[in-house]
Structures are given as structure tokens and as C-alpha cells.
């Protein structure tokens, strides 16, 4: 398999159509002999109004890439932009506001507050920020996700799939510029997982949203417009209009050629049990998308 050029791999887009981008993005953990290079000079554009999946084995850098693009983690070198805003030079308070106002998050854990009903969980980030939701948009999101008859239910009264639908509605409710989803179907059975993936697809097609999803599942990646394959902290390939079979075959080819090594442990940093929060990697600043400053 030939190695595509860096420009081909990242499909650098026109600025007006870019939701997020990175140039020379490098992230290292530790120092000296214990240094782990999680991302190695990555150049990538995330096209606006598209569904992008990021795939790779454990330790390939996929979650670290999402964290850096979302401002949940600092970078060791390089630059990151959300739209026209360079976020690599922002202070933590500015990053917190940017995440709260312009980014939606979905994690493997649903992160719903058990004492709030579905509607209250959906509007929680805006309530914390002291903002009123766009009523027409909120009602459209609720209907699109089929939650109209579940709005007064608390999380314990909802199935796993319904809880993740609430989490999806929460991510969409503020009409963000970009939604980051980290293994959003990881805690769901296959039927519920397909429902959530269908809703993310519909958010792009019907609501003109932009979604970036980290996944290890070829079936999940097949719902996207574009798959970026990471290996050893680099983007090693890409696939337009993916199918589950084609993605699985591509991953097998990487494994056989050693193009996607999995020697490193999983990327540092996992989602917390608090709504919309993220545990920062060692020596990284705290990252809470919902914190009010």
C-alpha cells in the first residue's frame, strides 16, 4: 500500500468550510526517557456540515486528537483553531467559555444528573451559563430525537438508548458549531447504538450540524462521511463514503503492514461521571466544558 501525501491524508479544505483545524499538532506526555508522543505533527481540517469518524487502535492518538481539537487538553506544539478562533493561546477561563458556547460533547458515559428530568438535563449547560435556549430549535431537536414523551422522566426511568438520546439532545441544544462524540455507543446494545448513530447522521443531514466521532467500531464509522485513520500519533489514511466492510478491511491491512502499531497504552484521559466534564491528563489543566466562570 502506498503512503498518501500529508495533504491528501488531511484533505485541507477552504477556510470558509472549516469547523476546526490543526497544523503541526503535537502532544507529548512525560519527559526524558519516559516521554510518550501521543500526536506527531498532525495537520487536519474538519469540514463544516459533515460527519467525520476518527479510528485507530488503542494508543493511536484518536482520543488525544479529539481532546486537543476541543480545547480539553493543551498541546505541546502546533496550532489549533475552532472556526477562525485560534484556541492554543487561550487562557483556561476563555477555553471554558468557548467550549460551553460553541462545542457540544457526547461521551461513552451518559453523564446525566439523576435528580433532573430529561428536559432539565438537556438544557443544563445553558442553564449553568445563564443562557436561554432558542425555543424553536430546542423543540426541533427534541422531536428529531424522539424524546417528546420522555421529557419528564428521570435517567433511572429511561433505557440506555434513551439516556444517550438525551445526551445527544444536550449536545445539540445550544446549536454548537461542532459536536465531539467519544465512543458514544460504547455502553449501548447494538439496537440502541444504531439508533444513536442514526440520530447523529440526521443531525448532520437535517440540522446542518458538524460531528466528529472517535470510535473503534467499523459499523459505527460507516455512518460517517469520512473516516480518518490514526496510527502512532499520525493520520495514516482516510476513506470517503465508508462501509463497515471497507473500514474493517483497511484496518486489517494496517495491522498486517504494521502501519498502525498498538504498542502504547490507551490515550491518557477518560470521561468523568460528572455531566459534561473531562478528567485532564497528568500535568494538564482541568477541563470542564460546563463550568461557569
Language-model region placement:
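Polar/charged alpha-helical tracts
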Residues: 7-10, 14, 67, 134, ...
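ABC family nucleotide-binding domain
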Residues: 17-226, 230
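Conserved beta-strand-loop-alpha-helix hinge in the C-terminal portion
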Residues: 234-258
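Intrinsically disordered, low-complexity terminal tails and inter-domain linkers enriched
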Residues: 4-17, 259-292
Amino acid at each position: 500500500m502506498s503512503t498518501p501525501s500529508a495533504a491528501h491524508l488531511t484533505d485541507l479544505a477552504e477556510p470558509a468550510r472549516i469547523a476546526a483545524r490543526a497544523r503541526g499538532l503535537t502532544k507529548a506526555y512525560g519527559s526524558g526517557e519516559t516521554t510518550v508522543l501521543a500526536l506527531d505533527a498532525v495537520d487536519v481540517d474538519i469540514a463544516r456540515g459533515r460527519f467525520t469518524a476518527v479510528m485507530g487502535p488503542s494508543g493511536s492518538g484518536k482520543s488525544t486528537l479529539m481532546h486537543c481539537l476541543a480545547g480539553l487538553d493543551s498541546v505541546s506544539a502546533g496550532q489549533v483553531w475552532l472556526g477562525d478562533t485560534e484556541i492554543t493561546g487561550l487562557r483556561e477561563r476563555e477555553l471554558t467559555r468557548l467550549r460551553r458556547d460553541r462545542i457540544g460533547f457526547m461521551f461513552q458515559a451518559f453523564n446525566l444528573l439523576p435528580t433532573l428530568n430529561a428536559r432539565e438535563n438537556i438544557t443544563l449547560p445553558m442553564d449553568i451559563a445563564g443562557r436561554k435556549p432558542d425555543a424553536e430549535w430546542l423543540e426541533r431537536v427534541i422531536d428529531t430525537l424522539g424524546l417528546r414523551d420522555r421529557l419528564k422522566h428521570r435517567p433511572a426511568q429511561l433505557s440506555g438508548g434513551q439516556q444517550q438520546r438525551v445526551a445527544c439532545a444536550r449536545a445539540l441544544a445550544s446549536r454548537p458549531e461542532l459536536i465531539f462524540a467519544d465512543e458514544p455507543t460504547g455502553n449501548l446494545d447494538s439496537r440502541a447504538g444504531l439508533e444513536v448513530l442514526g440520530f447523529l447522521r440526521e443531525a448532520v443531514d437535517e440540522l446542518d450540524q458538524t460531528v466528529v466521532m472517535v470510535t473503534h467500531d467499523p459499523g459505527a464509522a460507516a455512518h460517517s462521511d469520512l473516516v480518518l485513520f490514526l496510527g502512532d500519533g499520525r493520520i495514516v489514511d482516510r476513506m470517503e463514503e465508508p462501509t463497515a466492510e471497507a473500514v474493517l478491511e483497511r484496518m486489517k491491512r494496517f495491522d498486517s503492514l504494521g502501519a498502525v502499531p498498538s504498542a502504547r497504552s490507551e490515550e491518557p484521559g477518560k470521561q468523568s461521571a460528572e455531566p459534561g466534564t473531562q478528567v485532564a491528563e497528568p500535568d494538564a489543566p482541568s477541563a470542564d466544558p460546563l463550568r461557569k466562570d
